Swiss-Prot record:
Pfam families, A to Z: Ribosomal_L31e
GO biological process, one term: cytoplasmic translation
Source taxonomy: Eukaryota, Fungi, Dikarya, Ascomycota, Saccharomycotina
Annotated keywords: Cytoplasm, Ribonucleoprotein, Ribosomal protein
Localization annotation: Cytoplasm
Major subcellular location class: cytoplasm
Species, as recorded: Candida albicans (strain SC5314 / ATCC MYA-2876) (Yeast)
Protein name, entry field: Large ribosomal subunit protein eL31
Function as written in the Swiss-Prot or TrEMBL entry: Component of the ribosome, a large ribonucleoprotein complex responsible for the synthesis of proteins in the cell. The small ribosomal subunit (SSU) binds messenger RNAs (mRNAs) and translates the encoded message by selecting cognate aminoacyl-transfer RNA (tRNA) molecules. The large subunit (LSU) contains the ribosomal catalytic site termed the peptidyl transferase center (PTC), which catalyzes the formation of peptide bonds, thereby polymerizing the amino acids delivered by tRNAs into a polypeptide chain.
Regions annotated as coiled coil: none
Family: Belongs to the eukaryotic ribosomal protein eL31 family.
InterPro entries for this protein: Ribosomal_eL31, Ribosomal_eL31_CS, Ribosomal_eL31_dom_sf
Length: 112
C-alpha cells in the first residue's frame, strides 16, 4: 500500500503505558502529544490534526484523569491548500465504544 492512499482506520491506543510515571499535572498535555506521535507513526505524515471532540474526551476527567485506553479513528486525507508543505494530513477523532476490550485495528470504508 502506497503512502499516497487516502485511508481511514480505527485504533485502540493504550495511553496508560505512555503516561506511566508522568507528573499528574502534565498527563493530559502529554496524552495529546502521544496521540499525535501515534498518528504520525501509523499514518506517515507529520501534519496531524485533532478533532475538538477528541480534546474534550481527553480533558473530560481533568488534567490527571486521562483514560487508560481510547478508541481513535485516524484518517489520512489530501491537503488541498495551495502552499501546503505536505500533500497529506492525518485527522484524529474519538470513537465512542462501551468497552475497548478485544477491539482490533479496523479499516473503515468511507462514503466520500
Amino acid at each position: 500500500m502506497a503512502l499516497q492512499d487516502v485511508v481511514t482506520r480505527e485504533y485502540t491506543i493504550n495511553l496508560h503505558k505512555r503516561l506511566h510515571g508522568v507528573n499528574f499535572k502534565k498527563r493530559a498535555p502529554k496524552a495529546v502529544k502521544e496521540i499525535k506521535k501515534f498518528a504520525t507513526l501509523h499514518m506517515g505524515t507529520t501534519d496531524v490534526r485533532l478533532d475538538p471532540k477528541l480534546n474534550i474526551a481527553i480533558w473530560k476527567r481533568g488534567v490527571q484523569g486521562v483514560e487508560n485506553r481510547m478508541r481513535l479513528r485516524i484518517s489520512r486525507k489530501r491537503n488541498d491548500e495551495e502552499d501546503a508543505k505536505e500533500k497529506l494530513f492525518a485527522y484524529v477523532e474519538p470513537v465512542i465504544v462501551p468497552s475497548t476490550k478485544g477491539l482490533q485495528t479496523v479499516v473503515v470504508e468511507d462514503d466520500e
